[in-house]
Regions:
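Double-stranded beta-helix
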Residues: 113-158
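A short, N-terminal "cap"/entry segment at the start of jelly-roll beta-barrel domains
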Residues: 1-53, 139-158
């Protein structure tokens, strides 16, 4: 199944999609346009959710397998958030362990790859890709409170 078979629901200020369980991401295959690359267990969210500020993907790598190539970026750094499994991550000539709870940031120039070192469990992660050096604010500076009592009653349900 390709990720084009996924659908999102939208409202005035949001989009939502259900990808299913991380352990079932292997049913999706990403095929890179203009390149002979097929990646099983990878779903990009930019088109699905109409993202405007980042590319995000969710990923699943079967036991005892490796991503079959190294890659870099021209402009974007990547943040990897590991949510299940155990593996190893390689940046340039440095290899380090990753597991649930590990977070990795890689500069655009970093040559990267990873592998699943488990005999039984999938390695699952989320990747956030955004322009390096573009975020100068502190996390809370852009947000502001809304003077409204929280209520879950009488709301539209999707």
């Amino acid at each position: 199944m390709t990720q084009s078979s996924l659908a999102s629901k939208t409202g005035q200020n949001f989009a939502v999609a259900d990808l299913g369980l991380f352990s079932e991401l292997h049913q999706f295959t990403f095929e890179a346009p203009e390149k002979p690359i097929k990646l099983e267990g990878k779903v990009f969210l930019k088109q699905l959710l109409s993202l405007t500020s980042a590319e995000i993907s969710v990923n699943n790598l079967p036991p005892r397998t490796s991503v079959p190539f190294y890659h870099k970026h021209r402009l974007n750094e990547e943040i990897y958030i590991f949510v299940r499994g155990t593996g190893e991550f390689q940046v340039d000539d440095c290899v380090f362990p990753v597991h649930e709870g590990t977070v990795v940031r890689v500069d655009p120039e970093g040559e990267r790859c990873m592998r699943n070192t488990s005999d039984a469990e999938e390695l699952c992660w989320i990747v956030i890709q955004s322009r390096a050096g573009s975020y100068a604010d502190h996390t809370i500076q852009d947000g502001f409170g809304v003077q409204k009592r929280v209520s879950w009653v009488g709301k539209e349900r999707l």
